[in-house]
């Protein structure tokens, strides 16, 4: 049985059924190999689940995404899902503070023949976003932006990338169910990092829910992904 990333609305058995019948049989070999490599990494709880990778890949194809951004890549599973979904001349601006983790997945990206679609920037994303926002030529130029990084900056990311994504484009925020802690009482026992980030995730969701520039959909895939579609 697959462990971790259980949907909050599903049993382990049902999730395993989904993986074995519709996810694993269609998973590209390069993504399968990267998933197996990542499972051995000491921080593998940060990984993107296989069903979420499939969801991202199909979502990008549905909107014909070409110019994309990813904030937080870990070992590149979601990044590879994106790179495989966009056209050969498509681009991904990928940002992470840890190049070593990024390079774990790089051989699989190169093997898949999509490394040329990725521009990797090591370091905090906020300064890069500030530079992009400052130049209005960048406004409304991104088809899809995926955020899977420091939860305490999620709201700061949103304030910037909402200008960068085009009208009709999508923003995906990962981990928005945050291990189910979002529905727990304030005094519920939980690990320190869960409690710390929980409030920032809740802050983001409240902000998205009342933002008139977007429409949102929260899905129980992986640890929860909230899609925001810019409408104005």
UniProtKB/Swiss-Prot annotation:
Binds 1 divalent metal cation per subunit. Gene3D superfamilies: Vaccinia Virus protein VP39. Pathway: Aromatic compound metabolism; phenylpropanoid biosynthesis. GO terms for biological process: lignin biosynthetic process; methylation. It catalyses: (E)-caffeoyl-CoA + S-adenosyl-L-methionine = (E)-feruloyl-CoA + S-adenosyl-L-homocysteine + H(+). Keywords: Lignin biosynthesis, Metal-binding, Methyltransferase, S-adenosyl-L-methionine, Transferase. GO terms for molecular function: caffeoyl-CoA O-methyltransferase activity; metal ion binding. A divalent metal cation binds at residues 148, 174-175. Its cofactor is a divalent metal cation. The keyword Lipid metabolism does not apply. S-adenosyl-L-methionine binds at residues 48, 70, 72-73, 78, 96, 125, 150. Methylates caffeoyl-CoA to feruloyl-CoA and 5-hydroxyferuloyl-CoA to sinapoyl-CoA. Plays a role in the synthesis of feruloylated polysaccharides. Involved in the reinforcement of the plant cell wall. Also involved in the responding to wounding or pathogen challenge by the increased formation of cell wall-bound ferulic acid polymers. Belongs to the class I-like SAM-binding methyltransferase superfamily. Cation-dependent O-methyltransferase family. CCoAMT subfamily. This is Caffeoyl-CoA O-methyltransferase.
């Amino acid at each position: 049985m697959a462990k971790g990333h259980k949907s909050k609305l599903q049993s382990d058995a049902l999730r395993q059924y989904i993986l074995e019948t519709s996810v694993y049989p269609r998973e590209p070999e390069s993504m399968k190999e990267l998933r197996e490599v990542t499972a051995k990494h000491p921080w593998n709880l940060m990984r993107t689940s296989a069903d979420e990778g499939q969801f991202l890949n199909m979502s990008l194809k549905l909107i014909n995404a070409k110019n994309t951004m990813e904030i937080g890549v870990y070992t590149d599973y979601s990044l590879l899902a994106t790179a495989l979904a966009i056209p050969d001349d498509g681009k991904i601006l990928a940002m992470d503070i840890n190049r070593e983790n990024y390079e774990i997945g790089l051989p699989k990206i190169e093997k898949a023949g999509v490394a040329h679609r990725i521009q990797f920037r090591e370091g905090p994303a906020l300064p890069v976003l500030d530079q992009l926002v400052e130049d209005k030529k960048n406004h409304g130029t991104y088809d899809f932006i995926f955020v899977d990084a420091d939860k305490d900056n999620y709201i700061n990311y949103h304030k910037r990338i909402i200008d960068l994504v085009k009208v009709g484009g999508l923003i995906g925020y990962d981990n928005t169910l945050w291990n189910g802690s979002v529905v727990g009482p304030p005094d519920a026992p939980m690990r320190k990092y869960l409690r710390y980030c929980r409030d920032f995730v809740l802050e983001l969701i409240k902000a998205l829910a009342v933002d008139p520039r977007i429409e949102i959909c929260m899905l129980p895939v992986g640890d929860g992904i909230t899609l925001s579609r810019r409408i104005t």
